[in-house]
């Protein structure tokens, strides 16, 4: 909690941030002020585009200067103004006294280096730890953030880890130097609910042990309620309300704060008709990845990412797939979509596709779409939003004129709640939540029959989550879409899924109608998942910890 009679560790005073492009200037942060005391957790909350991440990035001067500028303000850390600090002095602070966890792990991890090397570089640079000592410290950090069998992950590359595992590696890197201030920008966005709770507990323990302060940027008010000492509510670049968590949650003063507290996905999934045709079916699906060792790189074992799964999706039906990160849920979706090799039988709208090559799948791709977990990693930074969304139309609907394509793109953007005029802009100009909506628009513009939704709402604030759930329901009802909905957010799954598959270590733990499983889970593991999801507390049960 906040200490009294002491100076703030961080003091942001009258901070403004402006972006300049093509002669136009937009203000992203407008005269923001707040303090952060030693050992305190301050949450900066607001919807995507509110300016909270821009504020956080300003502290370490990570904005795209000179396109970005600060018309006003100071950022004092340990009495030093970060905005005027020389670059050499700033580098000494970055990654040492102040570390940062970003929202999208793939933007922070080097795809060419192993996990051991990336964590080891930090230990060598800041603590002069090398060799066996660095390896041991790396193993300790990976264990701390909940990565099972860390010895097997040391030589892994980022693309070989699940989204949640990548996020945990990034947290381990940030904690390696025991910083005074940790800036956490949606640090648990990609994590399943049980590990989310464990990571929050871990961060809380580290805060207590080392007197570490935290600036916690999030859209998840449930986390704020459990974890923060004070909260600052942002919208349109301004802080509109600040106070203790208890004050803001029990007696919100500003209309926008009341709007945030009231917004979350609600409602029931559309009715599923068992007489509707089967769109996608998988029987005994297996995806095994070989583990190689020795000079000859012989196969000594397998990671059984998916191990004998049966699944059926009908037109107008949503099957939710839930489980901890690394459980195999995304791998199952990729196998059904024929984006990775698998064993077992797969049929799509009556066609057996399990033996189809890449070329044979091409004519079906427009009807079989994917929305990925990490929007930044799936959107080309060199293409405008309009070009990104129109790309599939150029391949699959070549008869369309340029004007017809443009109309389809504009309609798709409107459907996901974005201004069609934004189609001339580029992905880096959007917030994380806006980028996710662009990814959804890109999939929907092709009018698919089957859509794999891999954490489609994970980067979205609560009110936009609710809008996207409503949008997905409307699109499903209109076009009889079959959704494979992969998520760790069981609140969203509850609002959207007709049927549920609970996965763990590549196998089905429990499956059936979603309403029945939510009301009366049969397996200990499912009970632990539900307890963590709806209470945001670390669940200490063998079902989760083993």
Curated annotation (Swiss-Prot):
Signal listed as a keyword: no
Compartment(s) of residence: Cell inner membrane
Highest taxon above the source species: Bacteria
Topology in membrane: Peripheral membrane protein
Pfam families named in the record: ABC_tran (PF00005), oligo_HPY (PF08352)
Primary localization: membrane
Family annotation (CDD domains): ABC_NikE_OppD_transporters
Binding site for ATP: 46-53, 323-330
Keywords per UniProt: ATP-binding, Cell inner membrane, Cell membrane, Membrane, Nucleotide-binding, Peptide transport, Protein transport, Translocase, Transport
Disruption phenotype: The deletion mutant is hypersensitive to ampicillin, in a manner only partly dependent on the beta-lactamase AmpC. Deletion of the yejABEF operon leads to the accumulation of anhydromuramyl tri-, tetra- and pentapeptides in large quantities in the extracellular milieu. The yejABEF mutant displays cell swelling and lysis as well as a severe growth defect.
Entry GO CC: plasma membrane
One of the GO BP terms on file: protein transport
GO molecular function, one term: ATP binding
Coiled-coil regions listed: none
Top EC class for this record: translocase
EC number per UniProt: 7.4.2.-
Domain ABC transporter as annotated: residue spans: 12-261, 291-530
Family membership noted in the UniProt record: Belongs to the ABC transporter superfamily.
Function: Part of the ABC transporter complex YejBEF-YepA involved in the uptake of muropeptides, the breakdown products of cell wall peptidoglycan. The import of muropeptides into the cell enables peptidoglycan recycling, which is vital for cell wall integrity in this bacterium. Is also probably part of the ABC transporter complex YejABEF, which is likely involved in broad-spectrum peptide import. Responsible for energy coupling to the transport system.
Subunit structure, interactors included: The complex is composed of one ATP-binding protein (YejF), two transmembrane proteins (YejB and YejE) and a solute-binding protein (YepA or YejA).
PANTHER family documented for this protein: D,D-DIPEPTIDE TRANSPORT ATP-BINDING PROTEIN DDPF-RELATED, TRANSPORT ATP-BINDING PROTEIN
Name of this protein: Peptidoglycan transport ATP-binding protein YejF
Organism of provenance: Agrobacterium fabrum (strain C58 / ATCC 33970)
GN (gene name): yejF
């Amino acid at each position: 909690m906040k200490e009294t009679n002491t100076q703030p560790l961080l003091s942001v005073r009258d901070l403004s941030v402006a972006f300049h492009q093509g002669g136009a200037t937009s203000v992203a942060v407008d005269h923001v002020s707040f303090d952060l005391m030693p050992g305190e957790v301050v949450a900066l909350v607001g919807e995507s585009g509110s300016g909270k991440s821009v504020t956080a990035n300003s502290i370490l001067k990570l904005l795209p200067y000179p396109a970005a500028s600060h018309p006003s303000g100071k950022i004092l850390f340990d009495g030093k103004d970060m905005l005027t600090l020389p670059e050499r002095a700033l580098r000494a602070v970055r990654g040492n006294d102040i570390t940062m966890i970003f929202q999208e792990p793939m933007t922070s991890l080097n795809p060419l280096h192993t996990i051991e090397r990336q964590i080891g570089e930090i230990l060598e640079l800041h603590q002069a730890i090398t060799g066996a000592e660095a390896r041991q410290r790396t193993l300790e950090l990976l264990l701390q953030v909940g990565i099972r069998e860390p010895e097997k992950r040391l030589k892994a590359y980022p693309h070989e880890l699940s989204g949640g595992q990548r996020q945990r590696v990034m947290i381990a890197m940030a904690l390696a130097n025991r910083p005074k201030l940790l800036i956490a920008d949606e640090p648990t966005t990609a994590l399943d609910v049980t590990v989310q709770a464990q990571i929050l507990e871990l961060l809380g323990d580290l805060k207590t042990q080392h007197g570490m302060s935290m600036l916690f940027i999030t859209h998840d008010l449930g986390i704020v309620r459990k974890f923060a000492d004070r909260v600052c509510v942002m919208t349109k670049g301004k802080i509109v309300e600040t106070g203790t968590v208890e004050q803001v949650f029990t007696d919100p003063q500003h209309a926008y704060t009341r709007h945030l507290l009231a917004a979350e996905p609600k409602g029931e999934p559309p009715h599923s008709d068992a007489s509707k045709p089967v769109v996608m079916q998988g029987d005994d699906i297996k995806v095994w990845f070989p583990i190689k060792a020795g000079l000859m790189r012989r196969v000594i074992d397998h990671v059984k990412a998916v191990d004998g799964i049966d699944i059926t999706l009908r037109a107008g039906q949503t099957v939710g797939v839930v489980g901890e990160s690394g459980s195999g849920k995304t791998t199952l979706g990729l196998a059904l979509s024929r984006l990775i090799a698998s064993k077992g039988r797969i049929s799509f709208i009556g066609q057996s596709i399990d033996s189809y090559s890449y070329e044979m799948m091409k004519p079906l791709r427009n009807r079989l779409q994917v929305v990925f977990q990490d929007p930044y990693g799936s959107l080309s930074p060199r293409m405008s939003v309009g070009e990104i969304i129109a790309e599939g139309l150029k391949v699959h609907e070549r008869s369309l004129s340029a004007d017809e394509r443009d109309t389809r793109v504009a309609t798709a953007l409107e459907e996901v709640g974005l201004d069609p005029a934004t189609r001339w802009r580029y992905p880096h100009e959007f917030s994380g939540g806006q980028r996710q909506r662009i990814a959804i628009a890109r999939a929907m513009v092709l009018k698919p029959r089957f859509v794999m939704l891999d954490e489609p709402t994970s980067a979205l604030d609560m009110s936009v989550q609710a809008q996207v759930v409503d949008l997905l329901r409307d699109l499903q009802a209109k076009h009889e879409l079959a959704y494979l909905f992969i998520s760790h957010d069981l609140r969203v799954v509850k609002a959207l899924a007709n049927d549920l598959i609970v996965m763990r270590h590549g196998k089905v733990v429990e499956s059936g109608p979603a309403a029945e499983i939510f009301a009366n889970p049969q397996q200990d593991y499912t009970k632990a998942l539900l307890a963590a999801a709806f209470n945001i507390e670390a669940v200490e049960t063998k079902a989760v910890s083993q």
